[in-house]
Amino acid sequence: MPHAPAKRQKREEYKNALHEDESNAALPKKKFYRQRAHANPFSDHSLTYPKSPADMDWASLYPAYAVVKREQKSAGEEESTPLDEEEQRRLKAITKNVEIADIGCGFGGLLFALAPKFPDTLMLEYVQEKVRALRLQNASIQLYQNASCLRANTMKFLPNFFSKAQLSKIFLCFPDPHFKQRKHKARIVSYTLNSEYAYVLRPGGVVYTITDVKDLHEWMVGHFEKHPSFERCEKEFEEEGEAMDEGVGIMRTETEEGKKVSRNGGMKYVACFRRVEDPEWP
């Protein structure tokens, strides 16, 4: 009597079926995806990174915003005609820059809630298949064309993707607390990393943080407040009420981890930090 297919085989069969039927607009099922809550930032994962933001293939993530529509070229043309570096960059380019980054996006709940609220803003965050499905479901109104995701090590390669002062918002939602002191170096907030966030964030842009771990909250607040490029946002900006920022409201309620904390009656600690103008050179 044959054995039942292994979980891995079931996952592969499910994913292959999705890829074969490009018109299938059903949302992907989480049970067929291995989603680790956290990844080791010090491991050398088999990932490809652009040499610089100019070499990043944004057109494949946001085809609706591509400078050159790839379907206009046949595969034969691309293979028979070698492209110079400038032409290759044009094929990868999009008509506007990504402005919102959710670092550590989980299942993408935050980004999918933000996308309709900021329809003209490109955002980056199991999720890529969900992006494809939502685009198909909303093809008539072109919704979710502004949302996408990629897997990358932010702690090592953030400036490879984003140029100076490109982003307007960075979200750090329920990051790994790394409780042990010897693991604190792996936390997504540190004085060194804050300098990288300051580099890619435009003056007036905001870093949003939320966690259910008070110790981590105090750590993030302490490190951002010590950094000369950031200042704490007003309490009204962070706290629930009429003056609360729209991004804070979505961050509190729309992430999967945030929903779980609400179900369990846990605390949510929010802190937001605004990028200040750089001082003039003497």
From Swiss-Prot:
- UniProt enzyme class: transferase
Q: Which SUPFAM superfamilies match?
A: S-adenosyl-L-methionine-dependent methyltransferases (SSF53335)
Q: Which residues are listed as membrane-spanning?
A: none
Which positions are catalytic residues?
176
GO term, biological process aspect, one: RNA (guanine-N7)-methylation
- Keywords for the protein's UniProt record, in alphabetical order: Methyltransferase, Nucleus, RNA-binding, S-adenosyl-L-methionine, Transferase, tRNA processing, tRNA-binding
Compartments (UniProt record): Nucleus
CDD domains membership: AdoMet_MTases (cd02440)
Q: Region (Disordered): which ranges?
A: 1-29
Q: Which domain of life is it from?
A: Eukaryota
Q: Which GO terms describe its molecular function?
A: tRNA (guanine(46)-N7)-methyltransferase activity; tRNA binding
EC number(s)?
2.1.1.33
Q: Locate the residues binding S-adenosyl-L-methionine.
A: 104, 153-154, 173, 255-257
Pathway given for this chain reads: tRNA modification; N(7)-methylguanine-tRNA biosynthesis
According to the UniProt record, one GO cellular component term is:
nucleus
The reactions it catalyses are:
guanosine(46) in tRNA + S-adenosyl-L-methionine = N(7)-methylguanosine(46) in tRNA + S-adenosyl-L-homocysteine
Question: Does the entry feature the keyword S-adenosyl-L-methionine, yes or no?
Answer: yes
Q: Which family does it belong to?
A: Belongs to the class I-like SAM-binding methyltransferase superfamily. TrmB family.
Cited function = Catalyzes the formation of N(7)-methylguanine at position 46 (m7G46) in tRNA.
How is this protein organized at the quaternary level?
Forms a complex with TRM82.
Name-wise, this protein is tRNA (guanine-N(7)-)-methyltransferase
Which organism encodes this protein? Phaeosphaeria nodorum (strain SN15 / ATCC MYA-4574 / FGSC 10173) (Glume blotch fungus)
